[in-house]
């Protein structure tokens, strides 16, 4: 085997064929980083048949003018069960970056550490404990099992729905009551989904602004989303949920006709048997449903007059690769949250994964705190409702390449942090 530079074609073909291949280890991300002006490297291992058996996208950033900080975002893509290959790769990678004036190397592999439920209870070990000792022996320092959302470090916990050998009906059956109701609600209430073009991205951004204001979280800027849509191409999808009022009002009218028919039947039952409590209760329940139905029809007609026949209500931003569909971000119009548009977006993309033979639907990051007062408690509850599981990853590893200078660099950084 040999450590070597890879072409974009070689890199892309290999990473597309592997499990635990993150969207930041794709040709789209490589082209994005080139366009942003980063120094980038595609490296990997080839076997004796000249076949790629490991690959990694690296970016390099200047440090202290003379040196560089090398980072592989969720890399490398490699068969982690082959410990000999892992050892060879990281050993050769260290030699490679040293030749390019590397001060230190930072990696955060897409490698599971353990599995949990959404209450934070450990349900299984991923069998990768050996990796920590291996990296230590290779000169890497583990930065710890951090929790929460960090502006620099990748999130260590993902909420993931396993789709392997499942049907859409299986997914619905495994949801909790609220998720089932809202998924069925959007299916019958005229909520449609289509995909936004680059020119329509401001619709998504407006929803993100609404959501970030109501939930008090910091969103990425416009450039982040536009650039990824541009360079990832078909590997990014932005589904939009919208109300088609013609269909919505038609369905409500059909529902009203059925309710009126049932109500008349209940009234006749009461005439025949005035003492029948069940008939009285049924009448009251049907009348409540009719009142709610009339309110929805009136609201639908009013909104149709104000906004036209189609009203955007929610949108999401998704990364796609053969390994997984990733729900990266999403937002909903605060004024029309009651239409449950986010459920239509999720259901559309779950079915996209099922229809394209993608076995993993990644709801993406959670803090890992699993408490009622955690900043993402509501999000965790939402994801839990789909019967997803939590995957905790091994975390971040740093290897000083030039040890004397790195020691001086970290000491200076600590002093600056104290001052500022």
From Swiss-Prot:
GO molecular function, one term: nucleotide binding
One annotated GO biological process: regulation of cell shape
UniProt xrefs under InterPro entries: Acyl_CoA_acyltransferase, FEMABX, PG_Glycine_Bridge_Synth, tRNA-bd_arm
UniProt KW Transferase keyword: yes
Keywords: Acyltransferase, Antibiotic resistance, Cell shape, Cell wall biogenesis/degradation, Cytoplasm, Peptidoglycan synthesis, Transferase
GO annotations of cellular component type: cytoplasm
Principal location listed in the UniProt entry: cytoplasm
EC id: 2.3.2.17
Location(s) in or outside the cell: Cytoplasm
Reactions accelerated catalytically: beta-D-GlcNAc-(1->4)-Mur2Ac(oyl-L-Ala-D-isoglutaminyl-L-Lys-(N(6)-Gly)-D-Ala-D-Ala)-di-trans,octa-cis-undecaprenyl diphosphate + 2 glycyl-tRNA(Gly) = MurNAc-L-Ala-D-isoglutaminyl-L-Lys-(N(6)-tri-Gly)-D-Ala-D-Ala-diphospho-di-trans,octa-cis-undecaprenyl-GlcNAc + 2 tRNA(Gly) + 2 H(+)
Keyword Coiled coil: no
Pfam families xrefs: FemAB
Sequence similarity: Belongs to the FemABX family.
Function: Catalyzes the formation of the pentaglycine interpeptide bridge, which is characteristic of the S.aureus peptidoglycan. Adds glycines 2 and 3 of the pentaglycine bridge, using glycyl-tRNA(Gly) as donor. Involved in resistance to methicillin.
Assembly and interaction partners: Homodimer. Interacts with FemB.
Protein name: Aminoacyltransferase FemA
Organism: Staphylococcus aureus (strain MRSA252)
């Amino acid at each position: 085997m040999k450590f070597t530079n890879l072409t974009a074609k070689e890199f892309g073909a290999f990473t597309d064929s592997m499990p635990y291949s993150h969207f930041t280890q794709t040709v789209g991300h490589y082209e994005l980083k080139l366009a942003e002006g980063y120094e980038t490297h595609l490296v990997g291992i080839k076997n004796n048949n000249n076949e790629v058996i490991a690959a990694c996208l690296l970016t390099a950033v200047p440090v202290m003018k003379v040196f560089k900080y090398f980072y592989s975002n969720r890399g490398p893509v490699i068969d982690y069960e082959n410990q000999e290959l892992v050892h060879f790769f990281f050993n050769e990678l260290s030699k490679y970056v040293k030749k390019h004036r590397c001060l230190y190397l930072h990696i955060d592999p897409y490698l599971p550490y353990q599995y949990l439920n959404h209450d934070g209870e450990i349900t299984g070990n991923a069998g990768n404990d050996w990796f920590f000792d291996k990296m230590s022996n290779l000169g890497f320092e583990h930065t710890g099992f951090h929790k929460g959302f960090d502006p620099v470090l990748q999130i260590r916990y993902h909420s993931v729905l396993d789709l392997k050998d499942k049907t859409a009906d299986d997914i619905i059956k495994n949801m909790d009551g609220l998720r089932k109701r809202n998924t069925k609600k959007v299916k019958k209430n005229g909520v449609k989904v289509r995909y936004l073009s680059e020119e329509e991205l401001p619709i998504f951004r407006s929803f993100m602004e609404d959501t970030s204001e109501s939930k008090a979280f910091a969103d990425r800027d416009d450039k982040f989303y536009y650039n990824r849509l541009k360079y990832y191409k078909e590997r990014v999808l932005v589904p939009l949920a919208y109300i088609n009022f013609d269909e919505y009002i038609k369905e409500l009218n059909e529902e009203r006709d059925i309710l009126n028919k049932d109500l008349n039947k209940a009234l006749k039952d009461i005439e025949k048997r005035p003492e029948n409590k069940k008939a009285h209760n049924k009448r009251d329940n049907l009348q409540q449903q009719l009142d709610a139905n009339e309110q929805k029809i009136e609201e639908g007609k009013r909104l149709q007059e104000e906004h036209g026949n189609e009203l955007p209500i929610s949108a999401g931003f998704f990364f796609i690769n053969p390994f997984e569909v990733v729900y990266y971000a999403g937002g909903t119009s605060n004024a029309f949250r009651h239409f449950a548009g986010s459920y239509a977006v999720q259901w559309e993309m779950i079915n996209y994964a099922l229809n394209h033979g993608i076995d993993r639907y990644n709801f993406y990051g959670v803090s890992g705190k699993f408490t009622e007062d955690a900043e993402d408690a509501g999000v965790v509850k939402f994801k839990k409702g789909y019967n997803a599981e939590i995957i905790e990853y091994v975390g971040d590893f740093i290897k000083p390449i030039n040890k004397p200078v790195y020691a001086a660099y970290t000491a200076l950084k600590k002093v600056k942090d104290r001052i500022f």
